[in-house]
């Protein structure tokens, strides 16, 4: 029995069946390349759902991890630590916001935004107690916690987890008129993804982000952007909202914020919003821990110093152009921004992902019929050409 087979056997025997991974085991990674126990190399075209924008084991980020781990890793928020303040400042300046609240996972950050929006509605906007409403979009993916699941339009995500949280309205993605109709005096916030990742790399109609922003401003509704996947360079801009020069009231960040090395997430907003929290109203034992903050500072430095948003834009345009040259009856559409790309098929994407894996290219289906290509942003043009040849080969053979 191979090492790969044995590890998969153990995983399936003892692990809860809440994921459906491709049959590959990864033991090493560097840059855009990963390796299995038998020494086979693969190109990573998923980047851990955009958490590894800086590439696997970026030297600067790993060095920050090692140096901080040699000093102190966790203090809790009962005490100050020497990494949190500098990290706050870095994220505040990057987002242009007054305040930042740290958590660990993207779903926790979404939960934080949800709570902040509701409390803001009561304490600032003056909504009657327990009447606050949140507007979200169809086919969203904001995580797996109860608030996130309650916001989902997927019945499968909700099945068996009811009752759902009240006060949530779901509108079609990219529909400004539907947003206008959904708003009432009780509306606290509009929470959205500027590009829907899990839904299949869905890009809203041109002008939607700006128009929706204006509607929210006219109605005193918080405009909250979930940039967990689309942010930090993935879409070819620092934030996907930058495509329409929109600055949301609140950013929700995660994934690449930790450089693929240590989990860290946050929400960033001005004082009139995050000021609704007081000691004891929200928190996390690990949120803002010194190890995560040190890693995140280095992760953000890499994004800025290596101009990863600009790289993503240039190489993404090139990759999309090459993908669109592939002619095959199963291909319905190629779409994307930066290196955040979806190839929508007329059929299931899973068999294609399995065949690409056999050719040394790792990607994952999303929304059943979409192949998602989202490599680390440090990928080179030559490596993209290598990937294109594998994609062409797979489609030519099907």
Curated annotation (Swiss-Prot):
<keyword id="KW-0032">Aminotransferase</keyword>
<dbReference type="Pfam" id="PF00202">
    <property type="entry name" value="Aminotran_3"/>
</dbReference>
<dbReference type="InterPro" id="IPR015421">
    <property type="entry name" value="PyrdxlP-dep_Trfase_major"/>
</dbReference>
<dbReference type="GO" id="GO:0042802">
    <property type="term" value="F:identical protein binding"/>
</dbReference>
<comment type="similarity">
    <text>Belongs to the class-III pyridoxal-phosphate-dependent aminotransferase family. OAT subfamily.</text>
</comment>
<dbReference type="InterPro" id="IPR050103">
    <property type="entry name" value="Class-III_PLP-dep_AT"/>
</dbReference>
<keyword id="KW-0963">Cytoplasm</keyword>
<keyword id="KW-0641">Proline biosynthesis</keyword>
<dbReference type="InterPro" id="IPR010164">
    <property type="entry name" value="Orn_aminotrans"/>
</dbReference>
<protein>
    <recommendedName>
        <fullName>Ornithine aminotransferase</fullName>
        <ecNumber>2.6.1.13</ecNumber>
    </recommendedName>
</protein>
<comment type="pathway">
    <text>Amino-acid biosynthesis; L-proline biosynthesis; L-glutamate 5-semialdehyde from L-ornithine: step 1/1.</text>
</comment>
<dbReference type="GO" id="GO:0004587">
    <property type="term" value="F:ornithine aminotransferase activity"/>
</dbReference>
<dbReference type="GO" id="GO:0055129">
    <property type="term" value="P:L-proline biosynthetic process"/>
</dbReference>
<dbReference type="GO" id="GO:0030170">
    <property type="term" value="F:pyridoxal phosphate binding"/>
</dbReference>
<keyword id="KW-0663">Pyridoxal phosphate</keyword>
<dbReference type="InterPro" id="IPR034757">
    <property type="entry name" value="Ornith_aminotrans_bact"/>
</dbReference>
<feature type="modified residue" description="N6-(pyridoxal phosphate)lysine">
    <location>
        <position position="255"/>
    </location>
</feature>
<dbReference type="InterPro" id="IPR049704">
    <property type="entry name" value="Aminotrans_3_PPA_site"/>
</dbReference>
<keyword id="KW-0808">Transferase</keyword>
<keyword id="KW-0028">Amino-acid biosynthesis</keyword>
<dbReference type="InterPro" id="IPR005814">
    <property type="entry name" value="Aminotrans_3"/>
</dbReference>
<dbReference type="GO" id="GO:0005737">
    <property type="term" value="C:cytoplasm"/>
</dbReference>
<dbReference type="InterPro" id="IPR015422">
    <property type="entry name" value="PyrdxlP-dep_Trfase_small"/>
</dbReference>
<dbReference type="InterPro" id="IPR015424">
    <property type="entry name" value="PyrdxlP-dep_Trfase"/>
</dbReference>
<comment type="function">
    <text>Catalyzes the interconversion of ornithine to glutamate semialdehyde.</text>
</comment>
